[in-house]
Amino acid sequence: MNSFNPLENVQKILKKSCEILNLDESVYDLLKEPERTIEINIPVKMDNGKFRIFKGFRSQHCDVMGPYKGGIRFHPTVNGDEVKALSAWMSLKCSATHLPFGGGKGGIIVDVNELSDNELERLSRGYVKELYKYIGDRYDIPAPDVNTNEKIMAWMLDEYIKLTGNNTLATFTGKALGFGGSYGRKEATGVGVAVITRESLKKLGINIRESKIAIQGFGNVGSNTAKHLERMGGNIVSISEYDKEKGVYTIYNEDGFNIADLIAHFEKNNTLFDYKDVKHISIDQFYSLDVDVIIPCALENSIGEEEANKIRAKLIVEGANGPVNYYADSILKDRNIIVIPDILANS
């Protein structure tokens, strides 16, 4: 990942967009910062009986379209500027797709691999204890994001109901079906990215059945994108992921992968590093692959100026939020490489 500040990135994009649309400068002033950002300290009793304090955030960018809406991520790199930027992207996504929501985003600075299941539950409930006055189905509606899932949403909703007496299940989305969740929610983003990829290739005169695709990130979005692209006939030849012990790694198979088998292996082992019959390549080689599409589905700022100059793909589809930074975007435009933006691709 590049060190380019994500808030600075989205502000540059907003500034340029306002200039292109010839909007009054006050529009940019309204959008460049969230309406509020809440920073909290969450005390959690660990399994050893000692307390540990975790830093958390919730950014509420703009509610002109409706209640704030956006995920909560658990990751060691979470910070205030990141959640501010992500909440701005959520405002743009909801507006672009005509959804009656504004933009929100939250997160906790934590490595979930270091916590037991009980500690993770106490942390999730603690986040709600500190923030419950600022959320609700008509005000701010959290959802899953990086390293959070339907189980964590269920814990959070349960805690919210205990604290408020308000049993409206719509306060949190992304829950299990038995707890007020929606059919297809888990796969929805990946399906959308896959459809956008197929249709974009079609515009370029490329049949998806003859395409080669590389995906960065194999979490919920990346794995479901791969699964549905394979069903459409796409050939996934490379996947880049992160392993706590190995760091960033990339697997490659010029003949393509069996995605169902990859998903099963990843769910069982939480890594693809040791997957059978693959070639390991560097992340630099990943960006330089002779493929038709690169789909970044990891974290923001994955593609900077250096990566943009190496890319040989004809198309980049932003499965993650803000994976191509402002400067890289200009380079790709000059090189006639099409970027399908996150506010459309993963909305």
Locate predicted features.
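Glycine-rich phosphate/diphosphate-binding loop of Rossmann-like nucleotide-binding domains
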Residues: A176, G181-S288
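General beta-strand structural signal in soluble alpha/beta enzymes
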Residues: A85, Y139-A143, N167-F172, S238-E241, ...
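Short, Gly/Pro- and small/polar-rich lid/capping loops
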Residues: N2-N41
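Glycine-rich, N-terminal phosphate-binding loop and its surrounding beta-alpha-beta segment
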Residues: I40-N48, I53-V112
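Rossmann-fold NAD(P)-binding glycine/threonine-rich loop
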Residues: A298-S347
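Short, surface-exposed connector motifs at secondary-structure boundaries
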Residues: I135-D137, I206-E210, L289-V291, A308-L315, ...
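Glycine/serine-rich phosphate-binding loop and adjoining beta1-alpha1 elements at the start
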Residues: S95-R209
